[in-house]
């Protein structure tokens, strides 16, 4: 009997670095509302993602998906390029 994979996280973010071979750095932005004052607070985090064919470049809006650990810091892979940088 084949087991189904668990739900994998999918995130959207902008590529901020593509200097490495087959690796991109993606900046993810989370927005949350302050519980008391109601101000929208932005927080960002950077993750490294696997880009097999070196398709993505700086400024591209990409979709990344969680995957098994590929190296010491890589746990995401490029799913698709949503919008190219102008």
From Swiss-Prot:
Signal peptide: none annotated. Keywords: Ribonucleoprotein, Ribosomal protein, RNA-binding, rRNA-binding. GO terms for biological process: translation. One of its GO terms (molecular function) is rRNA binding. InterPro entries: NA-bd_OB-fold (IPR012340), Ribosomal_uS17 (IPR000266), Ribosomal_uS17_bact/chlr (IPR019984), Ribosomal_uS17_CS (IPR019979). One of its GO terms (cellular component) is cytosolic small ribosomal subunit. It holds the Pfam family Ribosomal_S17. PROSITE patterns: RIBOSOMAL_S17 (PS00056). Belongs to the universal ribosomal protein uS17 family. Part of the 30S ribosomal subunit. One of the primary rRNA binding proteins, it binds specifically to the 5'-end of 16S ribosomal RNA. This is Small ribosomal subunit protein uS17.
